[in-house]
Amino acid sequence: MKKYGLLLFLILSISCFSENKKSQQLQKDIVKSKITEEKNISEGNTNEIYKDRMKNFIREIRNDAEKNKYIITQNGNELYFRDGKLDRNFFPVTDGTTQESLYYGDVLKYNAVTKKESKDYMLSLLNPVRKEGKPVFVINYAKGNEKKDFLLKEDAKTGFVSELLPEFEARAIYNPIQGFNSENITNLKQVKNYLLLLNPEKFSDINQYFEYLKNTDFDLLLIEPSHNGVFLTKSQVEQLKTKKNGGKRIVISYLSIGEAEDYRGYWKKEWSKKWPKWIVKENPDWKGNYIVKYWNSEWKNVIKEYRGKLESIGVDGYLLDTVDSYYYFQEKMENGNKIPD
């Protein structure tokens, strides 16, 4: 028994040492990135500044999250590159990524085929990411069996996992492109289909929402875990990790980190009258969503506290949305507009 106890102690010690090394490396990468930013500013090279700030924010979330949490980015796949090559310092920070409207849903037009130029550019980012082993989940906005057949053929070539959503608001139920299965899904690379449901307003309350989710067989749930401010319980989330058919699956919570949302529990009434200094403007395409200075410490604390709630209900990880908000600031900088911190 003593031998087994000693062996277990050594295994746990090695595991803790490994995790500490990862944490220390993330901290080093953050410091290194900040030094690089200062150098770029002094030399007038501003192309990477706002991308690097988003990368650092994601690193901080990874460093602060519970062990084994999955982190998936939504769009913004330029983050995985530097100078035209994969950014080896950032690439391992996340576990998967998504891309909206790769094939259908171009410029927020439902059923519209994405222009070849846009599609080819997105593929130039996604193909290297996938070949390097990171799962890629493609979100298309269209309908029709012919489109489903097309996506199946494309996925066979690329290794992506695509779905066809019936609307942009991600509030409707749909059948997956690949059929359901009863396999145990223990990591993102095993996922063959997923449910993206970010707006559960069609359900009467959190319990009806939970009952629906519980009775599905999707491999992966990418969901909003609350309804009208009421969150799923830890027990409910744990039940959702089993498909209706008995197979295990993964439950990921939506988390927007580049925009503030006035319908979230963290939103304070006074912000509607006077914005905090870290809110820049309202997103013209999505009412109630506000572009933020995501590098601001106050905003980071807002996200940290909100993420604490998500941790407490036991989700398997986070779908980090609006990571591509760096585009807004980068464009401002390129046009000669100074952005105060």
Kindly give the residue locations of the regions a language model identified.
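Positively charged n-region of N-terminal signal peptides that target proteins for export
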Residues: M1-Y4
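Glycan-processing catalytic domains of CAZymes
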Residues: K21-D341
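C-terminal motif of bacterial Sec signal peptides marking the signal peptidase cleavage site
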Residues: I14-S15
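Sec-dependent N-terminal signal peptides
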Residues: L6-L8
